[in-house]
């Protein structure tokens, strides 16, 4: 922003006890990504920016997640939970390095946008020492009110301390703040703990700014964007908002969804042009769907790629490592895992393909299973281009079926099959004419003798 550099501190030290979970609060998912990852993705990045996350003791998993999302991140530990200002000062080492702008955000607000972070910095460029993010609450009870006088923020009044007139105000504190880096540390270090809990509250910075004769401003945003997550119910509400956003973005990008309210997407889902998603499809992390592909109803996809004009489902499950080539088909009640299907390959019914490579235009018959696990290790199956595997076949890995080869239906194949060969691995059929009639007569006679 106009050459100003920026340090963002994300506070993520809370235990999240109301989540009633052993998982740290900020690692719970919304839209297929952790709460923390959404905030870090929205935070300013690129040249002239730096990022810090404050974590709680023993929360190495939070530090690891931060590093996964933003490899440039620094992490600091808040050893004691003594309030938000105390948490910010846990990252004092990063603050004293100097930055024009200091953004302070929270790891449990996954709906906040990069645009809002950018707008928070604008008053600093205009000379303000502090900007506070606010929103008009549908029900403001319990929120701190932002008291604005002559266009300037003069106080944050907690609900319990507010006058009747102030309680009627709907402009509330969202918690996110932006400080002018030149005065930030001086202000934050002056915050005291003379309150019932003996904690250091960042909200007290507004009063200190006024005492110093400096300016504090308010930036407004929508209530949904600043939803904090403290309970599983709030997590579910945030998921609803996130899914509505993701569906709208997909529709705006040209994806056809007949019943979008039944489709669940991940924040990193990538769509090509003219993609169709039928009802009741769940798309997890790491899925890319190329131009013209169709995902039919009741399918579940995670960490998979679907090629141009390919077809998946209905009732298909694509597990991590699946790659479906251009024009390939995955049909009903098919499960794939760590499987590559080349262009035009067909796996149309009732099949498991795992740890396998299926060549272009190969056809896999109904009921085929790649037997990839021997109880200790996984093994691969290679099926060549144009091969035909008959229905109800078991392919015992490690195994290679050559290009153009045929596998007879009902076979158990344990040895490699050369190109263009026929393999039949089933028992010899036995035929006894009249046996069924004699068997029924024998059973009926035995029943009559037993009943007398």
From Swiss-Prot:
CDD domains: GT2_GlmU_N_bac, LbH_GlmU_C
Active site location: 349 (proton acceptor)
Cofactor details (free text): Binds 1 Mg(2+) ion per subunit.
PROSITE patterns attached to this UniProt entry: HEXAPEP_TRANSFERASES
EC number annotated for this UniProt entry: 2.7.7.23, 2.3.1.157
Record's subunit section: Homotrimer.
UniProt name for this protein: Bifunctional protein GlmU
Organism: Nitrobacter winogradskyi (strain ATCC 25391 / DSM 10237 / CIP 104748 / NCIMB 11846 / Nb-255)
Organism lineage: Bacteria, Pseudomonadati, Pseudomonadota, Alphaproteobacteria, Hyphomicrobiales
Gene that produces this protein: glmU
